[in-house]
Amino acid sequence: MAAIVGIGAKLSLTSSDLLPGLDGAYYWVQVRSVLSNFTLAFSDLPLVFWIQAGIAKVVGNIPVAVRISDAVLPAISAIPIYLIAKNYRKPFLPAIAILVVLLHPVQLYFFTGDFIKNEATIPVVFFMALVLINWNKKSKRFSIISLVGLTLLIAISHFGTLLLAFMLVGAWALVQLRKSSLKFWLRGIAIAVAASAALMGMLAILVPSRYERLVNFITTPSAIFQNPAYDRIIHSPSISVMTIAIFIGQFSSLILGVITWYSRSKFSFSDLSLVISCLITTFIFSSPIIGMEWSDRLTGLSIVSLSIAAIIIFGSVEILWQKSLVTILAAVTLLSTLPLSTLEMKRVFSDQEYSDFKELASHVEVPNNSVIVARHGVEYLSAWEFATDVVLETYYESADVSSYNSVYYIQELGKTAPGMGGGGSKPEKPALGIGSSDKGGKADIPPNLPNKIEITGETIYSNSSFALVKVR
């Protein structure tokens, strides 16, 4: 029942034509490409898109399939959460834990529509936690094979969640194996290095842009602290879902850490190792000193490690004040969704603007071997409606578009840098095509890029909201 409530809450947020956030059409384009060409339109880790394509095959509608995946895939977390919580023989713990995770403000008001890959891989991390909790109950062969298999699932699904999994398992292993022999440690380090090298090699092949970002992060780790999240917290005129998540992550990890210390004798060794690992991960991932380019994603994922720790702690401690503190933290988390539910979720366009955008697309067909330039969010809708390659507006001046016969620009009238030119006639109607270019892929947008640039050309078609400008 708790899982059904979570699914219903997610579906209620995606009832409009456009998904919340800026990147919903990215998933539409990727799924269409999988169904049409058995490949992705933009380079990315493929598993979630293939699952969405399978759903689309069943329901016969790509946007509906993406909407279903947005609601159902995160709800799979209910299975491992139930299996973890039932170990502690607390009657209402499984249901409450499932509700807190599925109705968490980050789950509803940050992941929905925009970060489907992030939320879709969260259940796998809960399954990894289940394996670690049962480490001393199951055979080591079964546990290791399970961890390897689950890691591979994450590795072909989402890079950020892979970092979370490595952090959780790595910290757990450090606590578990701290009294092991030097030979055992050296063997473990060798295995970890080999696994990391293999995963980086796979990332370099599947998503070169993410591999380059990871290498840049390793070589210049100070970059992660540029434009720290606390600047946004201090200067923002209103509270945001991620500000709430940062406060919850920081304070909860400290409070739960104190409870764990006072009641450490009540935990099994495996449980204690996992709790310590989860609290360290939560505190680091939700830190406000992390730069905004990374902060939102890491803070969003920290709800997983925090939830795992809270379940184990509530199930293990016996003192009333300690249980009460965990209960209060869970209640605050759920109640924090109420003020956020009154706010309108950000979308690429209003309903009227989206109607005008589709009207524009219906009157113009873009020739083969063309690319459309548009602002973030609009580029994915352009790829969806015009079935062509796209490039992000803020990258246009540095992007190599020399291989394209034509370059077009989506001008939002009254919003972005104006185009120029007369009202040219519509082009002839050639066959449409879409390439597998990396341009326009779902990359992270650095916060210091200009919001708009001037792109000029000949207006091919316009309506009350948009103009299609031919740049060359």
Predicted regions, residues:
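Membrane-embedded helix bundles of polyisoprenyl
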Residues: 2-7, 28, 48, 52-57, ...
